[in-house]
């Protein structure tokens, strides 16, 4: 088995039966099933959703993105070995814990393969729900320049870089480009306040004002569940991004659920606890890869300056990263997954062939 063959880099070309275009994101691809296949699976598999619920196959890849670009490595390595399986395993673990502790359900109905989720269609909240327990990254850079108000929250004077904040804070941003909302620029990833959300809750996808309280509760409770569990592993849960949406349950009632992924090295910052106590930062998340890139390229401004996006895209496209750097990232992701779940992440010789075989034999989704 070659290392390159074990990586699933292209995940939008599987022969899954669908009558809609495949939606491809930076890491995942979504195949919406036909109405008849959705109904058949709901019946055959006993999924606890209404019969008319649209279902999708969500396939994760091993691609790695940073600074809005996809990077690759030497030797034809088009992604990070084990990354996709690690991300799914971590999310599966936290989603299960959330449900067991009575927080809320997720969009996942079934897990046919380490790279694959069967999900129900949700009506997404158009908010990136970001929770911070420490001041670092972009927040610290802004604070160091004199900013004190973040998303309507005022921080005290005298905070130090990487310090624990007095309390957990929520700093939401827009998900996608939203138009026609007073005071909110029509740009992706714009910081917003709770007041912005309350004044325009329907435009952000909330069905009621009270659901804003519920979303904040689920965000804080979910953060605490993950933070407490990671602390047992001597890991520090620094900050994270959650996503939420609505689904209709079997009784026809709308309910708020967790979506996308949670508590992963892609969506969170995680620090090594022993190193932090020694006043050092050891990143166990994608932040380590970002820092590597900033030190690796000749001109870091290319990665940071949005006005230089064409140069950045060319840099990512034309430069293969060292194999040892890619494998360091692999060890970070699989290491976190194995700590969190207690299970080994195994590389498959040909993950795409495995996925096709399972979806054909066990789910009848491939002709």
Swiss-Prot record:
Keyword annotations of the record: ATP-binding, Ligase, Nucleotide-binding, Purine biosynthesis
UniProt-recorded name of the protein: Phosphoribosylaminoimidazole-succinocarboxamide synthase
Keyword Translocase: no
Pathway: Purine metabolism; IMP biosynthesis via de novo pathway; 5-amino-1-(5-phospho-D-ribosyl)imidazole-4-carboxamide from 5-amino-1-(5-phospho-D-ribosyl)imidazole-4-carboxylate: step 1/2
Record PANTHER family: PHOSPHORIBOSYLAMINOIMIDAZOLE-SUCCINOCARBOXAMIDE SYNTHASE (PTHR43700:SF1)
E.C. number: 6.3.2.6
InterPro entries for this protein: SAICAR_synt/ADE2_N (IPR028923), SAICAR_synthase_Vibrio-typ (IPR014106), SAICAR_synthetase_CS (IPR018236)
Biological process annotations from GO: 'de novo' IMP biosynthetic process
Annotated catalysed reactions: 5-amino-1-(5-phospho-D-ribosyl)imidazole-4-carboxylate + L-aspartate + ATP = (2S)-2-[5-amino-1-(5-phospho-beta-D-ribosyl)imidazole-4-carboxamido]succinate + ADP + phosphate + 2 H(+)
Any single Gene Ontology cellular-component annotation: cytoplasm
GO MF, one example: ATP binding
The keyword Ligase is assigned to this record: yes
Domain of life: Bacteria
Protein family per UniProt: Belongs to the SAICAR synthetase family.
Cystines in this chain: none
HAMAP family cross-referenced by the UniProt entry: SAICAR_synth
UniProt organism field: Shewanella denitrificans (strain OS217 / ATCC BAA-1090 / DSM 15013)
Lineage of origin: Bacteria, Pseudomonadati, Pseudomonadota, Gammaproteobacteria, Alteromonadales
């Amino acid at each position: 088995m070659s290392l390159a063959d074990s990586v699933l880099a292209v995940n939008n070309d599987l022969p899954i039966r669908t009558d809609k275009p495949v939606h491809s994101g930076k890491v995942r691809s979504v195949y919406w099933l036909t109405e008849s296949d959705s109904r058949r699976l709901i019946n055959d598999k006993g999924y606890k959703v209404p019969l008319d619920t649209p279902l999708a196959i969500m396939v994760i890849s091993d691609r790695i993105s940073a600074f809005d670009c996809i990077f690759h490595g030497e030797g034809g390595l088009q992604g990070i070995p084990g990354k996709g399986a690690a991300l799914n395993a971590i999310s599966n673990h936290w989603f299960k814990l959330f449900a067991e502790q009575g927080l809320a359900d997720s969009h996942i109905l079934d897990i046919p393969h380490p790279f694959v989720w069967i999900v129900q269609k949700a009506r997404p909240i158009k908010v990136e729900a970001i929770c911070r327990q420490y001041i670092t990254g972009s927040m610290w850079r802004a604070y160091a320049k004199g900013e004190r108000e973040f998303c309507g929250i005022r921080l005290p004077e005298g905070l130090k870089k990487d310090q624990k904040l007095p309390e957990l804070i929520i700093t939401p941003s827009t998900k996608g480009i939203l138009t026609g909302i007073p005071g909110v620029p029509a740009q992706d990833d714009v910081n917003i306040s709770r007041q912005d959300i309350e004044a325009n809750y329907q435009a952000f996808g909330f069905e009621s004002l009270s659901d804003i309280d519920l979303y904040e509760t689920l965000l804080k409770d979910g953060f605490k569940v993950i933070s407490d569990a990671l602390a047992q592993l001597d890991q520090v849960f620094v900050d994270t991004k959650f996503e939420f949406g609505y689904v209709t349950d079997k009784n026809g009632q709308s309910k708020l659920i967790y979506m996308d992924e949670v508590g992963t090295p892609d969506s969170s910052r995680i620090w090594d606890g022993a190193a932090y106590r020694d006043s050092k930062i050891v990143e166990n998340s994608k932040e380590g890869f970002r820092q590597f890139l900033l030190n690796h390229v000749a001109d870091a401004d290319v990665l940071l300056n949005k006005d230089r996006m064409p140069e950045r895209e060319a840099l990512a496209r034309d430069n293969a990263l060292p194999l040892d750097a890619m494998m360091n990232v692999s060890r970070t992701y699989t290491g976190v997954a194995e700590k969190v779940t207690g299970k080994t992440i195994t590389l498959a010789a040909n993950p795409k062939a495995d996925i096709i075989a399972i979806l054909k034999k066990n789910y009848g989704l491939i002709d």
